[in-house]
Curated annotation (Swiss-Prot):
Protein encoded by which gene: Cnksr2
Annotated keywords: Coiled coil, Cytoplasm, Membrane, Phosphoprotein
Source organism (scientific name): Mus musculus (Mouse)
Assembly behavior: Interacts with RAF1, RAB2L and RAL GTPase proteins.
PTMs per UniProt: Phosphorylated on tyrosine.
Protein name as catalogued: Connector enhancer of kinase suppressor of ras 2
Domain PH: 570-669
Length: 1032
């Protein structure tokens, strides 16, 4: 501003006096006082009511007039470089919240009398005035171009005006202060919401651009011509240009546009002046005038003027002002605007906005004729103006010059004027295409920059109710139309050949949002387009994306999980995490360990690091990541989505959890808007095999998926190069014990506990169909091999019953025999892997190698198969699930570290099998490890009646155990011969619930003495210690 005009703070006393000469007539009497006191510009900006009174301005109204004009100077001096729509919205939002805080603070005070008083305090009214002042500053921007021409900003302006009027009405109502405050609180909250909406439009360049000053010189002014500007003055002294007369000096300079604010005339600041004084200053020098204009943001194009500029009338979003009778200071314009409206044309005054023409702007060629015959047919019956008669004829040459400035791929925003035209009329010929459409104001959320297309804007394009049209050449449209068709066929999985481009494209635009597809169909079918004005856009990238979205049904089956961990590559963060499964039943295992990989704001999890397909994935930008305090699992966090589902994860250590949370939040912050998924099925995907997680479901007899969960020889496992990097803990499949589900097989540990499971190759992995087709062995069992056929070991054993054959083939029934008797002996290379002493469920799909063992199993006493043997004994306390899993995992690792392979006879195998099955040589059930306790608790029978009885028995045993503990507590007191009153009082306070239960059970045995016993109990709790001793 220093290069254009001198700051107000550096004004001399003479400049202050010159400025005051243009103020209201009633203030001219005080100029001599200002001149006598030599008030400088800095003093003027800081002047107060008291100083004005010292200068002889005694009337409050005169003081307010001066202070309002000074406020305008302060805004010009201090806020020019920082003032924009966003900062003004912040100020209004702050004023509204300050008023809310003021009201809530008054109500918290002890001397609040708002329910009885009807007089608002002065400081309250001051806050209301400040709020309205902040709203006026915002409205000063919204009430003029370019914001007034945008529907969204126009609606916002009307809302702010309505709320301010409501606020002034509420203050003047006759009601209690409490009622007034409630109404004002509602208004303030609504205003805050409006401001937040404006602030949220940060992508709109009009919101964040500040105003700037520009000096314009108009010379060679003819006395009969005038300047040709239309100016509207606000009541507080702002002068806004609303339009120009065509072919006038203001029009020819091409620098004066609607919405510009006049700051200086011939280097004399006119802010706060009366309108007549401004007009006199403009006419002071007949040869020319130098104007300093404050120009608000118009567009992002700095290389050429914005297409919005040089509008001749008030925007359509605002109602035109009806000119009143001119005053003595109003001059008649030297040239009038011919407006082909239904009203009679009349000479409009310089200081008012002319009404808009009925027809939209139609560009013309050099001869002043319309360039297209279609437009002649369209405008039949209406007057057509040529040359300078057109209200915007200056745009004809300028628009032709400006058209080639923007590159071919630039998005141009145009105004579609053609109404009711058929598709044959709307198709483009080989004629020049520059004169079809007239660009007007940029809609909200869009900018004029063509080199860079923000992905956020591309995403919003598909959701806007009004789309935008890109105006392009014939060849470009044909090319993009072909790409649209090719991509549509590509997405449906069909091949298409390139078609030859035709000279006349069947359609010159395409509607992007689904809301506008009806209009497109009508254009293609040849039906007239509805008489509505639409904004359209044509973007090649968005068009292809739309095509993919429409045809997604054909490729939706292809999941993002079909990528191996190796092909996924190294992620931004990876490691072992626990994942909580959906609880299918009370007895199902809730947490399972997976290998997680964070890649490009997507989280994948695999069974191990060599898995060929992800077990699941989620798109993190769609989810909210936070700590999961509601989980009992330590170091748990969650990914929540209000409309889909929530996922729960847990880390081993606090540092791991913090590392994952930091990485996820850092990655999703950048992808939250750019990579948002369009379809809900892309938010997440998970393996379907977890659906059959409970034996009570109809899928309980279905075989598990052919994943690698079978044991393998030590030579193969120990040579595995895939070792978990950070923790020497069991891998996900090693620590995830098999529950009552059929698909969760336990990964057997063969070497060190740090060895990760190995993904089986296709030759080593066999499906259940292959197993069914496998020939039976001599024992009548399918041998479920985990190695190639030549490495498998078959044994000759006696045949068993079909029931036992089924139990050895399908894992769902394995709890009836092998959980009690132990696993069948395996081949020599595999035997020691299963017999690992971890208390987990033995494997049920291997072949018995000793017929004597079968005979023993078939002749075992019935008590060994009693389901009650599976019940958890009362002497072992129930612990949290996660603690048991960790303890069991450590126990498994310790027992497998020094495991040695030994060859033994059938008797040794039988003894070890009984030991692993937690059975004594006599067939009695014997508990060995903590995991065994847990497994025995979750074992279930297919008979629901038996399950209910077992559950009842567990309840009784748990109750008995609790009672035994209570009896032990009571015996401790009764067995103390030196018990004192103080000790008993302490004991009673510590076990008050137990004491009350004892008293209640005692009184229930004798109904006749209930009242007396209750009285004694009550008095025993309240009286002295001596009475308590007597009562005991």
């Amino acid at each position: 501003m220093a290069l254009i005009m001198e700051p107000v703070s550096k004004w001399s006393p003479s400049q202050v006096v010159d400025w005051m000469k243009g103020l209201d007539d009633c203030l001219q009497q005080y100029i001599k006082n200002f001149e006598r006191e030599k008030i400088s510009g800095d003093q003027l900006l800081r002047i107060t009511h008291q100083e004005l009174e010292d200068l002889g301005v005694s009337r409050i109204g005169h003081q307010e007039l001066i202070l309002e004009a000074v406020d305008l100077l302060c805004a010009l001096n201090y806020g020019l470089e920082t003032e924009n729509l966003k900062t003004l919205s912040h100020k209004l939002n702050a004023s509204a919240k300050n008023l809310q805080n003021f009201i809530t603070g008054r109500r918290r005070s002890g001397h609040y009398d708002g329910r009885t008083s009807r007089k608002l305090p002065n400081d309250f009214l001051t806050s209301v005035v400040d709020l309205i002042g902040a709203a006026k500053s915002l409205l000063a921007w919204l009430d003029r171009s370019p914001f007034a021409a945008v529907t969204d900003y126009s609606v916002t302006r009307n809302n702010v005006i309505q709320l301010c009027l409501e606020l002034t009405t509420i203050v003047q109502q006759d009601c209690t202060v409490y009622e007034t405050e409630n109404k004002i609180l509602h208004v303030c909250k609504t205003l805050s919401g409006v401001c937040d909406h404006i602030i949220s439009l940060s992508s709109d360049p009009l919101v964040s651009q500040s105003a700037h000053l520009e000096v314009i010189q108009l010379a060679n002014i003819k006395p009969s011509e005038g300047l040709g500007m239309y100016i509207k003055s606000t009541y507080d002294g702002l002068h806004v240009i609303t339009g120009t007369t065509e072919n006038s000096p203001a029009d020819r300079c091409k620098k004066i546009h609607a919405g510009d604010e006049v700051i200086q005339v011939n280097h004399q600041t006119v802010v706060g002046w009366q309108l007549k004084n401004l007009v006199n200053a403009l006419r002071e020098d007949p040869s020319g005038v130098i104007l300093t204009l404050k120009k608000r943001p118009q567009s992002m194009l700095t290389s050429a003027p914005a297409l919005l500029k040089n509008m001749r009338w008030k925007p359509l979003a605002l109602q035109p002002l009806i000119p009143r009778s001119p005053t003595s200071s109003v001059a008649t314009p030297s040239s009038t605007i011919s407006t082909p409206t239904k009203r009679d044309s009349s000479a409009l005054q310089d200081l008012y906005i002319p009404p808009p023409p009925a027809e939209p702007y139609i560009p013309r060629d050099e001869k002043g004729n319309l360039p297209c015959e279609d437009l002649r047919g369209h405008m039949v019956g209406k007057p057509v103006h040529k040359g300078s008669e057109s209200p915007n004829s200056f745009l004809d040459q300028e628009y032709r010059k400006r058209f080639n400035i923007v590159e071919e791929d630039t998005v141009l925003y145009c105004y579609e004027y053609e109404k009711g035209r058929s598709s044959s009329q709307g198709r483009r010929e080989s004629t020049p295409t520059y004169g079809k459409l007239r660009p007007i104001s940029m809609p909200v959320e869009y900018n004029w920059v063509g080199d860079y297309e923000d992905p956020n804007k591309m995403k919003r394009d598909s959701r806007r109710e009004n789309s935008l049209l890109r105006y392009m050449s014939n060849e470009k449209i044909a090319q993009e139309e072909y790409m649209f068709q090719r991509n549509s066929k590509k997405d449906t999985g069909k091949k298409s050949k390139k078609k030859g481009d035709k000279s006349n494209s069947p359609a010159h635009y395409s509607l992007l949002p689904s809301l506008q597809m009806d209009a497109l169909r009508q254009d293609i079918m040849g039906t007239p387009v509805p008489e509505t004005t639409l904004y359209h856009t044509f973007q090649q990238s968005s068009l292809q994306h739309k095509s993919k979205k429409k045809n997604k049904g054909a490729i939706s089956g292809k999941s993002k999980r079909r990528i191996s961990c190796k092909d996924l590559g190294r992620g931004d963060c990876e490691g072992w995490l626990w994942k909580k499964k959906d609880a299918k039943s009370y007895f199902s295992q809730k947490w399972k360990k997976y290998w997680f990989v964070l890649k490009d704001a997507s989280l994948y999890w695999y069974i191990n690091e060599e898995d060929e397909k992800a077990e699941g994935f989620i798109s993190l930008p769609e989810f909210k990541i936070d700590r999961a305090s509601e989980c009992r699992k330590k170091y748990a966090f969650k990914a929540c989505h209000p409309k889909i589902k929530s996922f729960y994860f847990a880390a081993e250590h606090l540092d791991d959890m913090n590392r994952w949370l930091n990485r996820i939040n850092m990655l999703t912050a950048g992808y939250a808007e750019r990579e948002r998924i369009k379809q809900e099925q892309d938010y997440w995907s998970e393996s379907d095999k977890e659906e059959a997680d409970t034996p009570s479901t109809p899928k309980q007899d279905s075989p598990p998926p052919p994943y690698d969960t079978y044991p393998r020889p030590p030579s193969m496992s120990c040579a595995s190069p895939y070792v978990e990097a950070k923790h020497s803990r069991l891998s996900s499949t090693e620590t995830s014990q098999s529950q009552s589900s059929h698909e969760e097989f336990r990964q057997e540990v063969t070497g060190s506990s740090a060895v990760s499971p190995i993904r089986k190759t296709a030759s080593q992995r066999r499906s259940w169909q292959d197993l069914i087709e496998t020939p039976l062995t001599s024992s009548g069992l399918h041998y479920l091999q985990t190695l190639p056929l030549e490495d498998s070991v078959f044994s000759d054993s006696a045949a068993i019953s079909p029931e036992h054959r089924r139990q050895s083939t399908l894992p769902t029934q394995k709890c009836h025999l092998q959980d009690h008797y132990g696993p069948y002996p395996l081949a020599e290379s595999e035997r020691m892997q299963v017999l690992n002493g971890n208390g987990g469920k033995p494997r049920s799909f291997t072949l018995p190698r000793d017929s004597g063992f079968n005979h023993c199993c078939l002749n075992t006493p019935v008590s060994a198969c009693d389901p009650q043997d599976d019940i958890q004994p009362p002497e072992v306390e129930e612990e949290e699930e996660e603690e048991e899993e960790e303890a069991a995992g450590e126990n498994v690792g310790e027992k497998n570290e020094n495991r040695e392979e030994k060859l033994g006879d059938s008797l040794q195998d039988l003894y070890r099998a009984l030991e692993e099955a937690s059975l004594s040589p006599l067939g009695e059930h014997r508990i060995s490890t903590k995991m065994e306790y847990k497994l025995s608790f979750i074992k279930r029978c297919n008979d629901p009646v038996m399950n209910e009885k077992l559950h009842r028995l567990r309840i009784l045993k748990s109750t008995l155990k609790a009672r035994e503990g209570e009896v032990a507590i009571i015996d401790k007191v009764l067995d103390n011969p030196d018990l004192t009153s103080k000790e008993f009082q302490q004991w009673k306070q510590m076990y008050l619930d137990l004491f009350l239960d004892i008293c209640q059970s005692t009184t229930s045995n004798d109904p006749l003495s209930i009242s007396s016993e209750v009285d004694v109990l009550t008095s025993s709790l309240t009286h002295t210690h001596s009475y308590i001793e007597t009562h005991v």
